[in-house]
Amino acid sequence: TVYAPWKDGYINDKKGHPDPNNNSIVGKLVFGKFSELFTGDASRDEENRLIKEENTKLSSRVLKVGHHGSGSSSQTDFLRSVRPEIGVISEALHNDYGHPNPQTMKRLAAEHITVYQTATQGRITIHTDGKTWNVTTEK
């Protein structure tokens, strides 16, 4: 299921310009009892709109943490709507942006979400038969 971008147009930044990050493709993969929510570079504004318009549909076992774990993504209300068991952060080691943001990591920990990071664990693979699932990492 694709939840965003929105049919009625872009979410704009504070200057009224379309914000590419807040217009990321957001989709949910469901296979049997397994589900994963992919959030692209979605930030706070897009997360808030998802909560408002799709709240009951967001719950997923796995969350691809938005915007590489930036401070503008994975707000507490959004995490509580998704209720993931694990979060996957795709980021480079020692990247120029400081991803993942320490506050984002604290929010994930506060919600008891197990975090996997490509920077430290390499390729992250999730295997499922639709009933059970497990995670393997390269490192």
What is the role of each PLM region?
Residues T1-V62, T120-K139:
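Core dinuclear metal-dependent hydrolase active-site scaffold
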Residues E47-G122:
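Cap/insert and terminal regions of metallo-dependent hydrolase folds
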